[in-house]
Structures are given as structure tokens and as C-alpha cells.
Swiss-Prot record:
One of its GO terms (molecular function) is ATP binding. Belongs to the class-II aminoacyl-tRNA synthetase family. InterPro entries: aa-tRNA-synt_IIb, aa-tRNA-synth_II, aa-tRNA-synth_II/BPL/LPL, Anticodon-bd, Anticodon-bd_dom_sf, TGS, Thr-tRNA-ligase_IIa, Thr/Ala-tRNA-synth_IIc_edit. SMART domains: tRNA_SAD. It comes from Thermoplasma acidophilum (strain ATCC 25905 / DSM 1728 / JCM 9062 / NBRC 15155 / AMRC-C165). This is Threonine--tRNA ligase. HAMAP family: Thr_tRNA_synth (MF_00184). Residues 1-49 form the TGS domain. The keyword Cytoplasm applies.
Amino acid sequence: MPDSIVHVKKGQRFLDVIKDKNVVAVKIDSVLHDLRDVAERDVDAIPVSVYSDDGLYILRHSAAHLLANAVTNLYPDALPNTGPVVENGFYYDFDMKPIGEEDLAKIEDEMRRIQKENVPIERIVYQKADLLRIFAKNPYKIRIIEDNVSDASSVYRQGNFVDLCLGPHVPSTGYIKAFKLLNIASAVYKHDESKTLVRIYGTAFPDEKLLKQYLNNLEEAKRRDHRRIIAEMDLAVFNSEWAPGFPLYTQYGQTIRKELLSYMDSMNRKNGWFDVWTPHVFRDTIWKQSGHYAKYRPNMYLFTLPDGDSYGIKPMNCPGHIAIFSRRKYSYRDLPVRYSEPGTVYRYEKSGEVGGLTRPRAFTQDDGHAFLRMDQIGDEIRTLLTMVKDVFTILFGNIELSFDLSVIDRDHPENYLVSYVCRNCGYRIEGARGTDIECPVCHSHDLEPDLSVWDNATEQLRDALKSMGIEYKEYPGEAAFYGPKIDVHVKDAIGRMWQLSTIQLDFFMPVNFGLTYTNSEGKEDRVVMIHRAIYGSYERVMAILLEHYAGKLPTWLTPIQTYVVPISSNFDEYARHVHEELIRHGIRSEIDTSQETVSKKIKLIHPYRPAYIIVVGSKEMETNSVTARNREGKSKTYSLSEFIDVVKKEIEQRKVDQAF
């Protein structure tokens, strides 16, 4: 049924025609409608299954209303604010007295009671004045109405609960069968940061099997949380008193960073990127010229020196690379010019938004900027896409990648940096943005947007993706105002998608900084910039690697590659010999010659996740061998020289899997 088309006659309710309980709405001319709606004319309606993306969104939105209904039943003084659908679930914010995790079960029980009653959910349209009267006791809803409703809007009623909403929703609460409340958090009200709201998170699925699978994955995700693994492996320190949001790496965490840095450096050199360095601080004039001052000022660290000079700690690396590029003139034969840098940037995030390595206030990007001609875009993109695939194959092995192409919204060119041609005098305005643009020659406002640069560049991106056999999704209107981009996501071991790489075209910076080259006819042409970060940032890729591998990183990335354990003090000398030989051959090794038992030594080192535990006793000492134990607990005996060769090969080839 959900994949078919249903003919509905004028005056019929969709709910009366479509009996499939897995259908939660209908789509007519690409617009979603409630099943309780009545057809205003004879229509062909597409049933929307609860198992579809649209259907799941509707289910979760309805579950958010069910949550608000339950909370206001149990806590009559609670004032609901908003309850949107988010990735993997929903939340609802309330102005209410504080509650704890122990209260979730009570709220969930009330939700189940309302669900079992199968209360009809009805859409009603009210004029603005009536809406203000209905929600007069809730200042949060009043603010939403005043800001967003001009004449009229809809509410959804289920029993005694009414909520301001555009919908659509499921026909009745009985459709919301598989749901779970997850946790409670605090949230700052966006219109008054002094006011803290109670945020309750939950999730909902079409059936119990999918819900159980998700909850199991959620538990696995908690076990794999990189913050937990970082503490267990002693990789970094997060000191909220001295450096809130700024990770401090131990020798073990820095080892992982250095390996990632070294690998990216080798890939950059292989692909023609020059390694550069730029300072962490610039005068604010460069940030004003680049546009970061206007756009990112609330998130920048700014300061003024006693002599009056104002400076900003860099939130991005691109202006520094532009400053290097601008030092000389270029011919068309000189391009492309590629600069790369492991550049640390600093962005102020609110304390509630900072978390681990995925949302720090300081992070290091594997940042690169290519300066090239328009006709070179396609080849450069192909090279970068190849680099992306090569890098992630090394880091993750055989992993699923997804590619998103964000392009311009052609119906709203005013939101982007485009060229305009004056219809009155023919003058061409390069790189303008906005609705009120005036021709500098004749002062006419009758301007024709010229999207040819965008179209040319976007087509080269499409061609690059297609020529490499890469499937991608295209998102109109999602491009940055200064150019289209490609985002790359990876799927980890438990099925989560993470965005890592970004390849971003930029028509804005070259205009702002006057970046040109001399073309084959001796004339000046505008340079095109490409911003690229393959890892995204070293912090983010490290976090994802730790969670993907549950801390059991490939040997080349593992801080402790071998851990040598003598079975008694009689073999300490041989154990030291093994340990020193491993180090001499470039293998990161540690040794435990304490008086603890072998089992206790192994138990103590287990959280650090060494690649191999080397146990030595009389047999190994007599034969100059080692017994190596891998992470799965499997043991194998090698001669010392053979084991060194095996591990060195595993490290040098950056293998994902262990030797045995």
C-alpha cells in the first residue's frame, strides 16, 4: 500500500479510504497531509509509510506531542516551549521545576496510558487572536505566535492537550507504539539566556524490534564513547577549571596525533601540496577583510594590546594561506598552487555545547587551500576525491562512504555571491550579494543575476563525482554563500554516519583579497579557491577512530604497540632485552617488571589496549623467542627477529588488521 497511489474522491477522508495501519499520512503534489484531512477535490494520494523517512519524522513529531501531553498531565505548572524532531529521536523543552532521571519512568508510564487510549489527534486552524487567547498562560507559545504567525495557524488537539504546530501528525495516539525516553538535560532559552529549561530527550520507531535494536546500539555507543576510552587509555586531559574546552594531550594521545599528522603529511607531499605554517594570531584587519570578523566575531577570541592594536586568534586558516599566496604574481602556467597546514584554530563555543574531541574550543585541521583556474576545478576535485578514498581506506579499511553535493538555490541568487549584469547599461558587477544592489555606472537596480560561474563550477563537481563512479546526493540551497561544496561521511562499526571531509569551492575570498593571475592573453583573471580538509580535524577523526575501533586502533596508530611481561623476576633481563630490541627497531614498547602476577599485569594494562602483549619465560629465553598475544586473546610464538619483522611490516604498511 505505501508504495502505491490511492485515488480519493472529493469529500472523502484519507483515513476512511486508506486502512493500512502502517500509513501515517499522505502526500499530494509533494505536500504532506494528515490522514484525518478531507480531500478538497478528486486526488491521487501517495500513502506515507511509517517506515519511510517522512513517516518516521511524523511519528517522532507526534511522540514529542505525546511527551508534552504526559508532562503537563503530571506537572500542571509545566510550560511547554518547543519539541522538534532531531537525529534519531526528538526532545521537548519545558519551563518547570527540576526533575531527575528517576522521573522518566513515571512520565513514560503516563505516555503509555495516553497511547493505549488511542486518543484522536485533530488539526484545527485558528486566527491569530484566538491563538493568543488559547495560549495566554504560556509566554513561550505567545512569543512563537507573535514572531511567526501573521493571520492564522494550526494547532493539534489530543484530548485535553493542545499544541501549536503545523503538522502533520499521526491520526491518533495509538499509532505511537514503540517509544522510549532517554535522558534529561538543561537548555538555555534562546530569547533569554538567563532562563534555563528542562529538556527531555526521547526516541520512537515504527516497531519494537527497531526500537530494541536502536537501544542496543545506544548502549554500544556508550561503551564506545571516545571520552570514556580517552580516560581509560590516558590519552588526554579535559580540565574544566584551567582549560575548559581545550584538550591537553598526554604522551599517548600525542602519539596518535603525530601518526595521523605524519600520514597526512605524506599524502600531501604525494599529491603536490606545499607544507606551510601560519601564526595563531593576526591583526583584526585581516579578519575584517576576510569577512570572519563580521560573521564569526561572537565565536572569536579577540584582544587589544596596550598600544591600541587589536588582534584575533585565528578561527580559520585560510586568510594566512591567502597572505602567503599574495606575496607574488602568477601566470596561468603557475596554477594550481596548493598550501597545506596542520593549523590549530580557536572558536568560542558555549559551555553547554563543548564536548570531548568532537566539539572542542581548539582543534587542529588538516587544512589545505588550492588556488587555481576555473578550468582546473574538475581535475583538482578528482584528485581530492581520490585522496579522500585512499585516506579512509587506510584509516578504516573497507568502510562505507557517502557523498553530498551542496549547490545553489537558483530561485534565490540574492543569498549567494554571484555576478550581476545591469539591464540598463550592460555593466557587469562581480561578486555581489543581497537584494538591494545598485549599478555603480547608471545607478539602476534592474540587474540580471549571472549564475554562469556557479553553473560551470557545479557541473565540474558533478562530472568529477560521476567520472569516478561515486554515487552522491545533491542538496539545492545547501551551498555556502561563496560556493558549492562536497561533504564526505563515513559509516562506523555500529552504523553511525560521521561527517569528516569537506571540499569547498570559494568565489568570495579571491574577490575580497583581489587574487588574480595573468591568463594566456596577458589579462588578469580571478583565481578560484578550494578549501579542503580530509580528516576534518585531527580531534574529530581521532574521536571517530576511537569509537569505531572501540579503542583497539590499528597497530600503527596504537600508542603502546607491544607490552612485554616476564612471567617472573628470573626473566626480567631477557624481557628487557626483548623490550630494547623492539624499541631499537622503531616499535613503541613498554615493559612491566613489577612483582605482580602475570594475570594482574595483563589486567592492569588491558584498558590501555596495547596491540600485542609479549609474555616471556624460560622457553622464550632459551630459544630467543617471544609469545605474542593479540587483542582477541589468541597467542602465537615467534622468534624475536621474526616477530619484529611481522610487527614492522604491519606498522609500515599501516594495516587495519593484526598479523594473526
